[in-house]
Amino acid sequence: MEPSIKYPIYEWELLQDTYYQKSAIGKAEWEYIDPVDFMFAVAPCGGAIAITRSESNLQSNYKYDQVPMYSICVFCLSGQLLQTLTWDKTSLVGMGWNENEELIVVSKQGQVRVYNLLGEFHQFSLGKGVENIGIRECQFSEGGVFALLQNDTFISITGFEEPWRKTYASIPFNTLEYYNIDSWALIPNPFSPDLGMDIVVTVGPHILQIDEQDSQLHSISSLQHVSHISISPNARYLALYESVGKVRVISSDFSKELLDLRLPETVAEASLKQMAWCGNDAVVLVHENLLTLVGPFGGSVPYLYNHTPIVSTEVDGVRILTKDSSEFLRKVPAPLENIFHIGSKTPGAKLVEAFQKMKLKSVFAEKMLLELKDELHDAVDTCVQASLNEFSIEWQKVLLEAASLGKNSLRMYNHQEYVDVCRELRVLNAARDPNVGIYITHEEYLHLGLERLIQRFSCRQLYGLAVQASMWMQIPCDWVYIQWAQTYIKQSSEPEEVVLDNIVKRLSSRKYISYEKIARTAYQEGRLILSTKLLDFEPLAKHQVMLLLNMEAYEQALKKVIETMDNNLIIYVVLQIKQQMAIASFFQILNEYPDAVKVYVEFAKKNDRKTLHDFFYQDDNKQGIAVLAVEDTLKTATVNQRITSLKSAAKVCSESKELSLEEKCLGDEIKLLQLQQTYEDQFTGNFVGLTVNEVVVKLIQINQTQRANKLRSDFQIPEKRFAWLKLRALVAIRDWVQIEQWAGSMRRSPIGFEPFVTEILSAGNKKEAAKYIPRCTQLTTQEKVDMWVQVGDVKSASEEAAKSKSGSVLGDLLERVQTMPESRFVQNALDQLRR
């Protein structure tokens, strides 16, 4: 191997049987600041560092002019200043980060601000009464703030968008006979309804776990005063530091004690500055300028510094920051140990050695590859995984080239995995660049997620890198362009035409990108003209509409929503406008858009008839008002109410010549209702709600023929329709006598006599039906023959057929009835015809 490349094992330290690696990840550029002199907070997963002047250490940091009073300086891990945040002249009690790299700042009065790296923030309070009590300390979880108040009670706020406050149970100091909280930490409670956090508190030699309801005392033998307590990233272990210089590690359920280590007196005598976990495997102690790594079985490794370091736990290690350095301490990942351990004979180590010999054109390289045989696949996988866990780009190349050599010798290998690893390394190395300063490990990358990492690029205004990383990983990046445009609008003082032109030019290459969020930002920044113009580029009208409503550009919103032809969206917009405007102004705007009127009318008929009536009234829409009145009759309980509603509708129609026909129809309906009410009073049965035809039928069936005739005259029922109604009414009640009398009284039936035959026959009375066949003068011989057959009178059918003197008619008839005894009549008629 080239001598210029430092072998990875040179950075390793052996702690009992486990290797740990402390890597320098860049020379800090903040040499004028010693972080230990300030209040600080380190973001997880290689994120930013926030420092501000600490009131508890003013003598040490008064000289730092580079950090202004009442300001928070945010640096990346390489020491570059990212942002300077200003806050009100209030005392801060704590700072913390979430994994979105948002800084959470808490004042002693209970005010909380959540900043992003652009300096934007939103603010809320920890609740009523906190300002008067005051906050002593605070700690942070991914989604919440936990505060110890001056009265020794705990509260929390979870959900920064919609803060939700919880108050924890009180500590029973009188029972414990100790009255000071020495240390505390947050521990997940898997049994709580919201999977929230409990608080572990040490009071003298006692340790308690408290939630909202109660406190639970845990017994730990010979426990002394605990000055520091820390929970591992996986929440399975608790580290306790006792004032006598003893370190204990117990399980988070308090069932097992895993470590009980007393430090040397020379170390224990010094004040412990910090205690933190190195991943989930070891504990780090900071005494002045000494950092001690304590292993799970009691071994330790000391690291001496020129300045007091500050430490911050990560999921796979611990970050170490001093005035002039930035380092990362972790347990050596298994793939790296397999390859680079001295004397390693693992398949991965052999493959790397074979590659190195191949570069030197050694004849032994191919022999070593052949010796791997069945282990070659495992060797390739190990090299690929080791490259992901290696910081050095030179060693990454060695490992990937070795893996490439091995996979090319395999017949069956998923090459896509190799490609994916190369892409991930490209992103990780870009993040670790000193100009970016996000020194993230692969395990932290898996924990954080690709989207959040790219979001960090964007929040640092490294938009080009964010787009490149998205392209490397083949994921959408439109949101990066949107964030760039939003930030540009917020920070630019250029004329709106210039801003618009620059945004459109930059985004023109992106098809189907949404301008709605950009336009919303312009609106929130008070740039209304720019917002409106940006909306013209929004491809989806429904996105335009929502923002136009917020901007109170109601006419534009109505115009845009009609283009969608989405009735649900149209009615939503119309109702929003109605809610925000005076009713007269609402009607005025609505009248200008007939398509919106149609949709609103259909909606209002079912949901808001009063407003619809007012709308028709102001528009002088007589027909609309009349229709509403008529529809209202269907919902009224009594006939008189219906008549009143119909009279109102008729009166409206009478005011317009164009509605004369409607007026007449309404008058007829009123007259019918009045008659129906009269009939119900005089006869049994229901008449109200029936049609004119149904009333006629019912009157005939109850032998009120004269009233039926009167109804026919009043409502001008055509003669044919009345005849049909009367026939069917009499057939329905089987009044054959009245049918016969009625038929006998008519010289000519308006509907003919064929319906008499068919209607009576359908009622099952063939004998009565046969009486009317002779009067069916309009029928052909064949039709009459068919009728006689239907009523079962074959003899009459044969006589009718014989009148035609047609052999074919008689022949067809004979064929139809030849199985019947009466067929002889047909045969006789046929014989007579042939003579």
Curated annotation (Swiss-Prot):
<dbReference type="GO" id="GO:0042144">
    <property type="term" value="P:vacuole fusion, non-autophagic"/>
</dbReference>
<comment type="function">
    <text>Essential for vacuolar protein sorting. Required for vacuole biogenesis, stability and to maintain vacuole morphology.</text>
</comment>
<keyword id="KW-0653">Protein transport</keyword>
<dbReference type="GO" id="GO:0003779">
    <property type="term" value="F:actin binding"/>
</dbReference>
<dbReference type="GO" id="GO:0016197">
    <property type="term" value="P:endosomal transport"/>
</dbReference>
<dbReference type="GO" id="GO:0005829">
    <property type="term" value="C:cytosol"/>
</dbReference>
<protein>
    <recommendedName>
        <fullName>Probable vacuolar protein sorting-associated protein 16 homolog</fullName>
    </recommendedName>
</protein>
<dbReference type="InterPro" id="IPR006926">
    <property type="entry name" value="Vps16_N"/>
</dbReference>
<dbReference type="Pfam" id="PF04840">
    <property type="entry name" value="Vps16_C"/>
</dbReference>
<dbReference type="GO" id="GO:0030897">
    <property type="term" value="C:HOPS complex"/>
</dbReference>
<keyword id="KW-0813">Transport</keyword>
<dbReference type="Pfam" id="PF04841">
    <property type="entry name" value="Vps16_N"/>
</dbReference>
<dbReference type="GO" id="GO:0006895">
    <property type="term" value="P:Golgi to endosome transport"/>
</dbReference>
<dbReference type="InterPro" id="IPR006925">
    <property type="entry name" value="Vps16_C"/>
</dbReference>
<comment type="similarity">
    <text>Belongs to the VPS16 family.</text>
</comment>
<dbReference type="GO" id="GO:0045324">
    <property type="term" value="P:late endosome to vacuole transport"/>
</dbReference>
<dbReference type="InterPro" id="IPR016534">
    <property type="entry name" value="VPS16"/>
</dbReference>
<dbReference type="GO" id="GO:0006886">
    <property type="term" value="P:intracellular protein transport"/>
</dbReference>
<dbReference type="InterPro" id="IPR038132">
    <property type="entry name" value="Vps16_C_sf"/>
</dbReference>
<dbReference type="GO" id="GO:0033263">
    <property type="term" value="C:CORVET complex"/>
</dbReference>
<dbReference type="GO" id="GO:0048278">
    <property type="term" value="P:vesicle docking"/>
</dbReference>
<dbReference type="GO" id="GO:0005768">
    <property type="term" value="C:endosome"/>
</dbReference>
<dbReference type="GO" id="GO:0005634">
    <property type="term" value="C:nucleus"/>
</dbReference>
<dbReference type="GO" id="GO:0005737">
    <property type="term" value="C:cytoplasm"/>
</dbReference>
<dbReference type="InterPro" id="IPR036322">
    <property type="entry name" value="WD40_repeat_dom_sf"/>
</dbReference>
